[in-house]
Regions:
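Acidic-residue sensor for enzyme active/binding pockets
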Residues: 66, 146
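Short, surface-exposed alpha-helical segments at coil->helix boundaries
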Residues: 39-42, 67-71
Length: 261
């Protein structure tokens, strides 16, 4: 079984991005959230194409406390960037839907799903708009760990033109970030949707370390409850990947057959 080598994989990804762009002109458009995935994806694109061919797009939803992390990313990488506040677009869309259908009849759970996923979809619309205006391709920044349990927004961050990280686990992505000497506070930032105080792992009910080990070794979690939770999330979200087939860097590493990936 092939083992993950951070130096080899990092160089391979950079070369893969170069190869993907060899017959294309224009920019790599990266939605910069301030988390590890967008930070590392932007850094890899800058290494492959040059910093001047990467446009970082910061998209706060109104007042957003962690937008400062997004600014750290573009400043550190020295890439061209712009800020597009999606707050007015989100509020206008929500108001229009409320006028068309009374929200009083909608469950709290459905409201939460809307509140979490709609900003991500608006951001992707904006990213493709910028790609059309400036000439470029939107970078998908999702990782394998998130994708196998559907922890991405269909029509939002799950979209893009190509995916440099889509077959790498969270632990592997972090290792690449450290290898590139990116700021540790960004590479090791605790993942969350930015909408509430809960982390992704708290919402998932298991750690990414546990999930990553299962993905790469095939050894199921000792907890039957966690195993079932992972499988339920995988099965309920697999339709996303039956529909979308992005060009994705393949590290040639084992993925457990349980995930039907």
């Amino acid at each position: 079984m092939k083992k993950f080598c951070v130096e080899e994989q990092t160089e391979n990804i950079i070369n893969w991005i170069k190869d993907w762009y060899k017959d294309k002109s224009g920019y790599a458009i990266v939605c910069i959230s301030g988390g590890k995935d967008s930070t590392i994806a932007a850094a890899l694109c800058a290494k492959a194409l040059g910093a001047d061919r990467v446009i970082g797009v910061l998209m706060p939803n109104g007042e957003q406390k962690d937008i400062k992390d997004s600014k750290k990313v573009v400043d550190f990488l020295r890439i061209p960037h712009m800020t597009v506040n999606i707050g007015e677009a989100y509020n206008a869309l929500t108001k229009s839907i409320e006028l068309a259908h009374n929200f009083d009849n909608i469950s709290d759970k459905s409201r939460e799903v809307y509140k979490t996923n709609t900003p991500a979809r608006i951001r992707m619309v904006a990213a493709f708009g910028i790609a059309a205006l400036y000439g470029g391709y939107v970078v998908n920044t999702c990782n394998l760990s998130e994708s196998v349990v559907g922890w991405e927004t269909f029509g939002g961050d799950g979209f893009g033109c190509f995916s440099p990280l889509g077959k790498l686990t969270v632990q592997e992505v972090i290792a690449i970030g450290d290898y590139l000497n990116l700021p540790k506070e960004l590479v090791h930032k605790v993942p969350s949707d930015g909408m509430c105080d809960s982390t992704d792992e708290e919402k998932l009910g298991f750690t990414y370390e546990c999930l990553d080990n299962y993905i790469r070794t095939g050894v199921r979690p000792k907890s039957a409850e966690i195993y079932q939770r992972i499988m339920n999330l995988n099965k309920s979200s697999h339709f996303k990947h039956e529909i979308i087939h992005l060009p994705t860097y393949d590290p040639g590493l084992y993925i457990c057959e349980d995930f039907n990936w």
